[in-house]
């Protein structure tokens, strides 16, 4: 059952909170609205052959935590805890010069990775990735080389993974994998719209290339879910849809909102909060493009298959003649970077996806480990950054259906910018006996009071509500190696006064209600 209709009370809230100010934070349930069962693929992740994400991250045969396949078991255990549903691989920019055939079989060919300008040993290839996914319990999502690769190379890769016949199906069997991998999710290219990408394409080139690649890939696996690199810019995505839309299931959108490519000067907490509305604006622009192209109402869905607040730090200053500053990539590992700002921005991003979950079907946090990842891997174990616990809460605490709500909220201002101080979504189980309301307080120092719509939920008002809260002593708190975690979800009971609940500053809170 993917969609159902529920009648709600249309009674408006008449009371205000104690000590109310001229404007209140008020949550209302939208009457007579359809509830949507969202796709938990929204809680997906991404991994790239960049720096220490794969080698020394999820894969390290020399580690004391390695299993018989060289996979870090502590990483696998942590990912199982947040029930990772899908992982996109191998890139990213890396894939635009990656030729998959060098990464299969007993004899591996080390290659020079022209995208990141290092050697890749190719010891972690297609078969290893899929085996790792099976251990984690997630779906493999393979992004193909549409930079220096060809449509035929892409379809050969599908053949290797999914067939038992032909040259490449037989090659997989000979490599020790008699059963097909049955990879369902495939993307044509990565960011081929950008001048930074090796093998970048023009608008005129991209649509025909995607069309022909998709035709070949579907000739191998007819029911494959196909993606293509797109943007929320109409000038790129509209021509793509006109040429190849009929072959696609998803447009692939990427987003990073704190650009740190060249200079590792992370935005402050309040600056980050001013960016929290940007992802939803991108989603709405993309939806408008899909509708104008005739692919609205879910005919083609949105996959935000790379996203994070902060972009990866890898200085090259726009000039390939200067190369990369390789040692500067270590700055991505600094624990103090990943504060409540990262956690709350990520929660706001997930809320935006869930509000539009009839169209936004998949999202992949970038990356899954190391660099800006939710988990930092080191020789003695792992560190769960603040963003890890956001996924822990969303995956394990939310119910399965989105209940449409409105949120009247006071503004939070900084310089010439402003955003709503609160962001919230409501989820329910199938028969509306359990509710989980997610609310984010973006204010760095002040508590906020929220009026809850008990009447709209057909619930009796209560004096107490159970909650799980993620916060810190300050907005700049972070978790670090060898110390007690400062930012970790805590279960508590909150008081409810005149239908209102008080939320801690810089916090992510999940409130639980039952009939």
What is each model feature region?
Residues 1-24:
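Bacterial Sec-dependent N-terminal signal peptides
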Residues 14-16, 316, 451:
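Alpha-helical transmembrane segments and their juxtamembrane interfaces
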Residues 22-235, 241-250, 279-314, 327-515:
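Non-catalytic accessory regions flanking glycosidase/transglycosidase catalytic cores in CAZymes
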Residues 247-250, 269-274:
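Active-site cores of enzymes that catalyze phosphoryl transfer or operate on phosphate-rich substrates
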Residues 255-271, 317:
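Active-site His/acidic residue clusters
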Residues 320-325:
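Intrinsically disordered, low-complexity domain-flanking/linker segments in eukaryotic proteins
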């Amino acid at each position: 059952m993917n969609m159902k209709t529920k009648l709600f009370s249309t009674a408006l809230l008449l009371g205000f909170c104690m000590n109310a100010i001229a404007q209140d934070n008020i949550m209302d349930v939208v009457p007579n609205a359809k509830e949507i069962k969202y796709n938990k693929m929204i809680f997906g992740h991404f991994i790239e052959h960049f720096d220490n994400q794969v080698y020394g991250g999820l894969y390290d045969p020399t580690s004391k935590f390695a299993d018989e396949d060289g996979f870090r078991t502590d990483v696998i255990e942590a990912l199982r805890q947040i029930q990772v549903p899908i992982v996109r691989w191998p890139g990213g920019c890396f894939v635009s010069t990656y030729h998959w055939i060098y990464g299969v079989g007993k004899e591996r060919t080390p290659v020079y990775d022209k995208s990141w300008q290092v050697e890749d040993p190719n010891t972690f290839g297609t078969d290893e990735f899929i085996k790792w996914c099976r251990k984690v319990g997630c779906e493999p999502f393979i992004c193909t080389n549409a930079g220096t690769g060809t449509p035929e190379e892409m379809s050969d890769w599908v053949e290797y993974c999914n067939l038992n016949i032909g040259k490449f199906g037989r090659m997989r069997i000979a490599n020790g994998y008699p059963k097909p991998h049955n990879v369902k999710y495939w993307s044509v290219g990565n960011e081929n719209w950008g001048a930074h990408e090796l093998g970048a394409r023009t608008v005129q080139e991209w649509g025909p290339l995607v069309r022909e690649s998709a035709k070949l890939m579907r000739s191998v696996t007819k029911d494959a879910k196909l993606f293509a690199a797109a943007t929320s810019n109409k000038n790129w995505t509209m021509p793509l849809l006109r040429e190849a839309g009929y072959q696609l299931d998803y447009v692939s959108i990427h987003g990073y909102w704190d650009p740190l490519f060249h200079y590792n000067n992370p935005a402050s907490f309040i600056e980050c909060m001013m960016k929290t509305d940007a992802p939803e604006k991108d989603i709405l622009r993309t939806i408008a493009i899909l509708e104008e192209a005739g692919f609205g109402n879910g005919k083609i869905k949105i996959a935000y298959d790379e996203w994070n607040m902060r972009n990866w730090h890898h200085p090259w200053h726009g000039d390939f003649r200067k190369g990369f500053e390789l040692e500067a990539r270590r700055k991505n590992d600094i624990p103090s970077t990943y504060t409540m700002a990262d956690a709350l921005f990520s929660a706001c991003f997930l809320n935006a996806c869930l509000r539009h979950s009839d169209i936004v079907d998949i999202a992949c946090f970038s990356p899954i480990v190391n660099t800006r990842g939710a988990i930092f891997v080191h020789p003695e174990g792992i560190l769960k950054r603040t963003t890890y616990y956001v996924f822990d809460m969303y995956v394990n605490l939310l119910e399965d259906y989105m209940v449409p709500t409105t949120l009247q909220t006071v503004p939070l201002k900084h310089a010439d910018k402003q955003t709503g101080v609160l962001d919230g979504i409501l989820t329910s189980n199938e028969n509306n006996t359990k509710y989980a309301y997610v609310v984010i307080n973006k204010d760095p120092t002040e508590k906020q009071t929220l009026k809850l719509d008990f009447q709209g939920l057909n619930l009796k008002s209560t004096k107490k509500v159970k909650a799980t809260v993620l916060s810190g002593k300050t907005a700049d708190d972070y978790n670090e190696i060898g110390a007690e975690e400062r930012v970790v979800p805590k279960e508590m009971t909150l008081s409810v006064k005149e239908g209102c609940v008080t939320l801690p500053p810089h916090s992510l809170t999940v409130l639980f209600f039952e009939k």
